Amino acid sequence: MIMDCDRIDLAEEFSTKDFLLSEDIMYEGDKVKILQKVKSQRQQVEEAMTKLKDEESVQNFTQYDIERQLMDNITEKQFSKYKKLLNKLETITHLIFSLSVRINEKKIFNSKHQGLVMLKYQMNNAKEVLMEIEKNLEQFLLFLSSNINPKFCDTFTNFINRKKHNICLRRALVRELYFIHLKFDIVNLLWTKKNPEKILLK
């Protein structure tokens, strides 16, 4: 399920209690310590992004092999159905990830605004669409099992699961990098406000 995608937890590298920025934080040692934590977090996320890019490259080759076998064993109409299912799966995965983020943000701020109700309604609709797509994929797998072989079906299933996972992971990493850069900007802003003659570099 898309909702079970891995979450990035960098709590050991960067504790929010050590990042209580205020105008009272004046000492250079404290600033350096904060920046070191943020840089460590950025490095970890960038390494994860590099690893993900490598896996995506391998996944592209896997997809090429899968689709080549499909074209050799099924009709053009059936192959077109597969491509449409794959495109729908990617689209709904992006949508569910985005809705999850927005709902979590509303909950964090204890929002009881009507917007939260609408987001939950949209999420329920998205889940129903996802269930229908997954049902169609299961039927497609049964068809493949009888027309190709079970081993190929295992490869196909693993490919689909990794594709969903990597879509969510990429979105999470990009989002995390955005907030890391934001932390750098906040530190620099507070520091230069009190020490205009000094500039912290990222």
What positions do the PLM features span?
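Long intrinsically disordered, low-complexity, acidic S/T/P-rich regions
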Residues: M1-K202
